[in-house]
Amino acid sequence: MKQLRLETINKVQGTVNIPGSKSISNRALLLATLAKGTTTLTNLLDSDDIRYMLASLKQLGVNYRLSEDKTVCELDGLGAPINSNVAQTLFLGNAGTAMRPLCAALTLGEGEFILTGEPRMEERPIGDLVDALRQLGAEVTYLKSEGFPPLTINATGLNAGDVEIAGDLSSQFLTALLMVSPLAKGDVNIKIKGELVSKPYIDITLALMAQFGVKVINHDYERFEIKSGQSYVSPGKVLVEGDASSASYFLAAGAIKGGEVKVTGVGRLSIQGDVKFADVLEKMGAEIEWGDDYIISRVAKLNAVDLDMNHIPDAAMTIATAALFATGTTHIRNIYNWRIKETDRLAAMATELRKVGAIVDEGHDYISVTPPTKPHTANIDTYNDHRMAMCFSMLAFADCGITINDPDCTSKTFPDYFEQFAALAC
């Protein structure tokens, strides 16, 4: 197993241009596929999740051209649902942002499709989405465990009608259903069961759908109306924002050991909810400066916070490790969906924080972190989870340094993360 030793960093200073958002990249690729016309996507993320989506689209007959650095994609839209005359098997790795939307999109046309992935993907639930698609007439069959991939889709189109979908587990299910509803055979009315988690991710979806010419009537995130007769039309060019979750590590670095750190590609005009991470840092005491497309974080004495972070679930992980440098006990609440991500992030975070001496209380949907007097070095397991690896890079700011096991798992969203992180040291 590869390991990366991070020695103590005493100060950070500099600017980081954040790579494209994973969530926006895969949503935009699918909408561009369904749209009329050719779309040029710029600042596309070059990572594992995007490669799985691109490979699947190519297998399904979608034509696109990638730039040499794979951050610009010119894609010829189908202007129609995806159809296939032969059975297709698509391998999607552990890419939830490909599995969920493709599962929904492939019900729109005609053909037989098998969706599969890595072993961890077979542990990530998809039942709430499948239940909703079945209410609209989709024929979806599980191949192993009920409610989980792999699965088979026998597509004949999606009916109009009223549909209920659970909102309390993952916003990706609703995102997938929203994106395909305009191409159903009539009006679709979606009712949310339970509390909708991660609402800002739904805002990303709605903003992108609007960019491609489709309107959704949003009744306070409890009901959504999608009128028939709409179609996706390419806007010509789509700029993929920087990944706000990935910005969180550099903003935390500035707050802990700045100097100042400036991240570009996200800012006050961002459509991503995870930019609110900067507000949490500010509540902890950091000095934050906002621009339209940048955020600056400056060093400060950090204090613990007690907050509901359901709206920023990915970026909230960075607060858990930043808490090691704050005074007091930090409480991160309403984050049950950490458990169904690339790994069970609540259990993994608690285990690894304890290795460095933190006192941790892990509950059903919360985690509390009390920092040790002095963190001690450890070998941090990353669970093939990119965000675990990046979060624990914060331990380079402790006097002991840290060893990251399997650092290359960051390839899911940020392949050169550790090089960019090291470049800030001064």
Curated annotation (Swiss-Prot):
Pfam annotation, one family: EPSP_synthase
Record pathway: Metabolic intermediate biosynthesis; chorismate biosynthesis; chorismate from D-erythrose 4-phosphate and phosphoenolpyruvate: step 6/7
Binding site for 3-phosphoshikimate: 22-23, 27, 170-172, 198, 314, 337, 341
SUPFAM superfamilies tied to this protein: EPT/RTPC-like
Name of the featured protein: 3-phosphoshikimate 1-carboxyvinyltransferase
Protein's organism: Shewanella woodyi (strain ATCC 51908 / MS32)
Coiled-coil parts of chain: none
Binding, phosphoenolpyruvate: 22, 96, 124, 172, 345, 387, 412
Family from the record: Belongs to the EPSP synthase family.
E.C. numbers: 2.5.1.19
Keywords: Amino-acid biosynthesis, Aromatic amino acid biosynthesis, Cytoplasm, Transferase
Active site: 314
